[in-house]
Amino acid sequence: MNQPNSDIASEGSLAGQFMAAFRNMLMNIDDMLPATVVSYDDKTNRAVIKPLVMMVSTQGQKVGRAAVPNIPVFRFGGGGFFIRMPIKAGDFGWLKANDRDISLIFQRGGLEDEPNTARLHTFSDAMFFPDTLKGWLIDGKNADALVIQSMDGSVCLSLHEGKAVLDSPVLEVNVPETTFNGNVTVNGNQAVNGNSDSNGGTMKHNGKDIGSTHRHDGVQSGNSNSGVPI
């Protein structure tokens, strides 16, 4: 039979008794544990979370912790903006307990209120912080960049010193009005479904002016066709 850890030198002493009592008190206090998502409701931003650190009995048997329901999921935000992640069952993260009962504060939408119960440091008043320990791929060219990307790196926004780079198989922009202040280079085909209006400067194709001031050779009055632009 496995026995709980003990310090033989302290057994029977007053210091040993205090240490045992203090340890028992700490074992009943929740703080933070690695955890996984059992289920998630995006409308309420609440999840069922299962801590991953198991308990061990004095007989050496591993005992899994019960899942904790109705846990708010952390979303980074402020000033009218936030970042949302599509939380899924099996996602890894951290379950962090609050110091006091926060149920009334959440019921009031984040307004100041008193603790509803005398609960202290329990996962009943916790939040879940999503995290990624592994499974992601970072391109070597982005080793020194701030990166927001999919786990496999197929879609990636990287912020480097002096430039920003977006890599994606497809980019869709739904914007009624778009303004570019500066030069634009298109390396590839371009299709325009609609009118095209150009003001100022010149318009060239293969080095030849095709704008409003361009000229043609071989022009004669009458019904003949003009030549190519010159």
List where the protein language model places each region.
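Low-complexity, small-hydrophobic/phenylalanine-enriched stretches
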Residues: I148, V155-L159, K163-F180, V184-V186, ...
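Short, low-complexity, Pro/Ser/Thr/Gly-rich segments in the mature regions of secreted, periplasmic
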Residues: N223-P229
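Conserved GTPase G-domain signal focused on the G5
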Residues: A15-F18, F180, N193, P229
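Hydrophobic packing positions characteristic
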Residues: N2-V170, N174
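Residue-level signal for pocket-adjacent positions within structured domains
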Residues: A66-V68, S198, N223
